[in-house]
Amino acid sequence: MNDDGKVNASSEGYFILVGFSNWPHLEVVIFVVVLIFYLMTLIGNLFIIILSYLDSHLHTPMYFFLSNLSFLDLCYTTSSIPQLLVNLWGPEKTISYAGCMIQLYFVLALGTTECVLLVVMSYDRYAAVCRPLHYTVLMHPRFCHLLAVASWVSGFTNSALHSSFTFWVPLCGHRQVDHFFCEVPALLRLSCVDTHVNELTLMITSSIFVLIPLILILTSYGAIVRAVLRMQSTTGLQKVFGTCGAHLMAVSLFFIPAMCIYLQPPSGNSQDQGKFIALFYTVVTPSLNPLIYTLRNKVVRGAVKRLMGWE
């Protein structure tokens, strides 16, 4: 503890993740639900990664980016869900200071990367529908790899900024994080000093990595809709709307909860409401992405048949 009463969490060695302790009667139910969705996430996303690697028909930009998204979702959920399951299962709800730093860094990094990657995926669909004759030039494999690397680098760079700013803030007295994982708004609530600079930085970068990507995605799909409406083929219309509709659903399931959490000051959030919103985009959305992208996809169904030897 400092002379002025402020606590450096590293000297204490741990944080207490309050999580859903206020509803002990719900913890078993939440544990079962979270475990089911986590297993769905692991199975569904591993399935997409393996299938995209094994089937040559899926060696296209769309499935390259989808494999990146699947790997991203695997990492994103694994950065917080195992800790949540441990806390829900038993009375021990602590996380080490180093563990909290690592978790905060990866949750932020992977979440930001997903925002950028979804923009890249929308651009790929725009190029495929609106610029079909130039698609192979626009989405050259080398350029696709560059876009994927840029997505990951931007996410991890942004996270380094926020993580360092957050853990420089001195804490006051207690170490109870009113959340189920280490997150910037929840950690800023522990501070006894003015955190307006941190909150402003969070809102600015959230606008850059949430609002701007969302605008770019909606612009891409707006152009796609206009191009599709000019098509004469009913089959083409159904195929394009089916693919783009699935992408937009995945975008909505990720961006809407993220905006509710990060585009307002930590003091403006209902803490309990924030937990359930975060539970949705860290548990539910990653498990639904494989279903959304592949459920009605004839190319994926064909790849499965070839892999199983049914064709």
Swiss-Prot record:
Family matches, as PROSITE patterns: G_PROTEIN_RECEP_F1_1 (PS00237), G_PROTEIN_RECEP_F1_2 (PS50262)
Keywords: Cell membrane, Disulfide bond, G-protein coupled receptor, Glycoprotein, Membrane, Olfaction, Receptor, Sensory transduction, Transducer, Transmembrane, Transmembrane helix
Protein's UniProt keywords contain Mitochondrion: no
Molecular function, one GO term: olfactory receptor activity
Coiled coil regions, renumbered to chain: none
Entry's family note: Belongs to the G-protein coupled receptor 1 family.
Provenance organism: Homo sapiens
Record annotation: effect of changing residue 113 to A: In allele 6M1-3*02; decreased response to C3HEX
Gene responsible for this protein: OR2J3
Lineage: Eukaryota, Metazoa, Chordata, Craniata, Vertebrata
Assigned GO CC terms: plasma membrane
Extracellular side: 1-28, 83-103, 162-198, 263-275
Entry-linked PANTHER family: OLFACTORY RECEPTOR
Gene Ontology annotations of biological process type: detection of chemical stimulus involved in sensory perception of smell
Cysteines joined through disulfide linkages: 100-192
Transmembrane segments: 29-52, 61-82, 104-123, 143-161, 199-222, 240-262, 276-295
Tree of life domain: Eukaryota
Name recorded for this polypeptide: Olfactory receptor 2J3
Outcome of substituting residue 228 to I: In allele 6M1-3*03
Residue intervals annotated with topology Cytoplasmic: 53-60, 124-142, 223-239, 296-311
Function: Odorant receptor involved in the detection of the flavor compound cis-3-hexen-1-ol (C3HEX), a compound typically described as 'green grassy' or the smell of 'cut grass'.
Compartments in which it is found: Cell membrane
